[in-house]
Amino acid sequence: MRGAKPASVLLLAIILSGCQLLPSGNRSSDSRTPPPIPRGTSQTGAFTPSVTGQQCFAQLSATGANYSPLPNANDAPGCTRIDTVSLGGLQGDVSRFAIANLGPVTCATASTFAGWARFGVDRAARVHLGSKLARIETMGSYACRNVAGSNKRSAHARAEAIDVSAFILEDGRRIAVKGDWNGGTPGERAFLRVVRDSACKRFGTVLSPEYDAAHADHLHLEVGDSSFCR
């Protein structure tokens, strides 16, 4: 029949018209925006928490703590940062409070610290001093160093210890280990000893001004299997 087009010509026309429906560029219509990177992981997969670390992160989240997981690192022989976090605000019974000058700590240390801060410090502040806790000041955590006067690595070299120097209350008072341990009011002295004793129930090693002169200005809180409190 005159005017009829061969079937091959019609098929080619259909294919070409379908190509015009594809978006411009070299992408197909199935391309999608990559999903967001989960918190605590890297796009390259350089940071993968251990199973224990993942479980601990879930437990730490349950305390209401603000934190960010950090990449693992081996800085020197005996100096490691494994399953560590950068710890921000913590949750008290009725309000949140901040943490000052704290470096990387293991998740287990952070979780223990969060429980102590809420149940041992915030509550003691309200009972003994009549004010809620606003901030805990520290002298740091991770440090690649030995125990003073020895060749043994400190717990600080594994990010498993925190040195606490003072507590700031919502009413503006600052209760410092140095000065108030022996020189504070009766309520302040009682408060500092209560928080020390509470820490002894949670941490493996707790050192206070009663231990030696090197700890006259802070409480050393260290996780572990040991049981030493002074």
Language-model-detected regions and their locations in the chain:
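Post-signal peptide N-terminal segment of mature Sec-exported envelope proteins
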Residues: 27-55
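C-terminal motif of bacterial Sec signal peptides marking the signal peptidase cleavage site
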Residues: 15-18
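Active-site-adjacent substructure of cysteine-protease-like catalytic cores
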Residues: 127-159
